[in-house]
């Protein structure tokens, strides 16, 4: 499965959980945020990882990636003039299904 299909599945999954998708593939100088959504009053920045092999796709997320997501999230909030709580979620898409890890990193 390619990254685009994984992100499409992740978006559909989040929408079914009541999330409102604001942006996809939002690019900044710090990198790209796969999905930006609203869940209640929170702005949620979602990193999507997919894979088929024996290595867990989440293992490809290191601290540098997390720091860059946090910087990109802060920049997004500033550029859009948004305030309020934020969080970073991770969605893992594999042939076995979709797993959603909420609030693994708070900005």
From Swiss-Prot:
NCBIfam families: PRK14677.1
Any one Gene Ontology molecular-function term assigned to this protein's record: nucleic acid binding
Protein's organism: Thermotoga neapolitana (strain ATCC 49049 / DSM 4359 / NBRC 107923 / NS-E)
Name of this chain's protein: UPF0102 protein CTN_0433
InterPro entries cross-referenced by the UniProt entry: Restrct_endonuc-II-like, tRNA_endonuc-like_dom_sf, UPF0102_YraN-like
Similarity comment: Belongs to the UPF0102 family.
Lineage, top ranks: Bacteria, Thermotogati, Thermotogota, Thermotogae, Thermotogales
HAMAP family referenced in this protein's UniProt entry, alphabetically: UPF0102 (MF_00048)
Tree of life domain: Bacteria
């Amino acid at each position: 499965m390619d990254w685009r299909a994984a992100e499409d599945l992740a978006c559909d999954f989040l929408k079914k959980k009541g999330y409102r998708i604001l942006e996809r593939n939002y690019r900044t100088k710090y990198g790209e945020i796969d999905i930006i959504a609203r869940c209640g009053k929170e702005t949620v920045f979602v990193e999507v990882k997919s894979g088929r092999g024996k290595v867990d796709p989440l293992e490809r997320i290191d601290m540098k990636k997390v720091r860059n997501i946090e910087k990109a999230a802060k920049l997004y909030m500033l550029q859009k003039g948004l305030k309020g709580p934020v969080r970073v979620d991770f969605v893992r898409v594999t042939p076995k299904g979709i797993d959603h890890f909420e609030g693994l990193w708070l900005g």
